[in-house]
């Protein structure tokens, strides 16, 4: 029964992969990046810092943190963010306009058809404004709850996939498959801890590292397997190898590409 469940999940991911209409950014080496979201991003020293360190290793140079920003509101949904304020780089102390804006929605936005429609409408407006500001836009597909969260459900990741992929396709933008990477990791190694053990909601350090590796590879189309960054020896070699492997395979399968 467990094997059949795993096969169904893998097949489901394959189906969604074939539905993606955008599989790359025009600019695969952005340095002026804005992340917009909630606590899923800022836990564990913040996802944007981990991605930046991976980019710096890949680029062979430092990324100016003055142009590399994170705007988060605890427990927020897409509609809670003032995109007009954030897109004016001067409001955030940035020196130049952003090249890429990554949008991350709230977990509750997948709860009902009405909420999913509101999410799509809000993203539509935001993406238009991002493009009018000269930047590319991407959606950060969130992960699903796991136990002990009281709302844990196998339907959640299905709704997340559909909402993010449909919305990205309708706006002709990239969707970053973080949620699918979490799912794939749990399928291959059920005992790995990608969520905080006390809530089954927020990412653990391993979860944040996996998410960062997926973002890195989705943006650059380079394999995370080439990255030596291990958060200053805070993450062990075996965990790094596994997380990089999952990120590599997820990104390749999702976009039907070969990472460099």
Question: Model-derived features: where do they sit?
Answer:
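Sec-dependent signal peptide recognition
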Residues: 1-8
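Conserved SGNH/GDSL esterase-like catalytic core that processes O-acyl groups on lipids
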Residues: 32-34, 41-120
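Short hydrophobic segments within beta-strands
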Residues: 36-37, 140
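Alpha-helical cap/lid subdomain in secreted, periplasmic
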Residues: 90-205, 217, 226
